[in-house]
Amino acid sequence: TFLSHDEMRQLMGSIREHFRLLPNGEYSIEVDPRKVDEATVALLGELGFNRMSLGVQDFDLAVQEAVNRVQSIEETESVLRAARANGFKSISVDLIYGLPKQNVISFNRTLEEVIRLSPDRLSIYNYAHLPSLFKPQRRIAEAELPTADAKLQILQLAIRRLTEAGYVYIGMDHFAKPDDELAVAQRQGRLHRNFQGYSTHAECDMMSFGISSISMVGPSYCQNVKTLDEYYDRLDNGVLPVMRGIELTPDDLLRRSIIQALMCHFEVSIEALEVAHLIDFKRYFAAEIADLREMEKGGLLRLDDRWISVQPRGRMLVRAIAMVFDRYLRADRERARYSKVI
């Protein structure tokens, strides 16, 4: 929504010229409520968008000032109402926990407002403070960031308040109303997760456009260059602006299926994996099983001959459980350990 109305019309016209868009498809757009008015929302509906994600982060003024993003409840509510009036069938709100000056009390007030607004979906993302990579974060005072314990308390609060309000806890960071397609897909075992979040469209190719965007086509990923100058230069020379890519190995695909199952359904059928990938699970994942046993002692999961099952206590930490099967992270840890020895 940083584009003007004319630019948005031109963009969607070009997309429709080159691609056949299904009449019953899902067409989603992420919106900054500070930059959008009712006329823009009406235009988006006219152009075919039917899903909207509203960036909120937090409604607490002190937190907003600390991250240099002041946004009133009224601005958000106005856009949300306009989306409903223009026929958007699903509206999502994005929150972030771990921001400077956040605490359980302030975030509880934000949750109360969000519950009152009653979006169809919510995402609650963990703030990653990486000032070396993101220049705007250098203005944030690290001393004002909540501790790890405080962040866990905020997440626990969010899970409790939202489930009490009738939302289904979809996974690591998503919530949805029981009749929302995400919740239905999870109940039916069709839920999928990609690098952008949860989706009802498993195994679909994803084509991305623009700087730094990531595409997923079949068993491969590729990422575009990170600067506009380089992006335009490559396009002007008839070259795809791809910076790097990877083709997944059979081992990558096996591990991806396990990570998907854990993050989407909180359980993995060992027997199904052995049949699909022709492996002996205990021998193939001996090192990983040792790590899982430690997590089992902490009550995070149950592991037997047939299933890996994430327990309620482990749902908040399902990312850490899934990371056990990421061989690239495991290799990084081994290299770090070797470096320390040297």
List each language-model region with its residue ranges.
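Short amphipathic alpha-helical interaction segments
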Residues: 280-296
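A short, conserved structural fragment
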Residues: 296-306
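C-terminal scaffold of the Radical SAM
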Residues: 1-282, 336-342
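Solvent-exposed, charged/polar functional surfaces in cytosolic regulatory/catalytic domains
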Residues: 14, 18, 294, 324
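Short, amphipathic alpha-helical interaction segments positioned at domain boundaries
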Residues: 313-342
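Short amphipathic alpha-helical segments
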Residues: 253, 257, 268, 287-290, ...
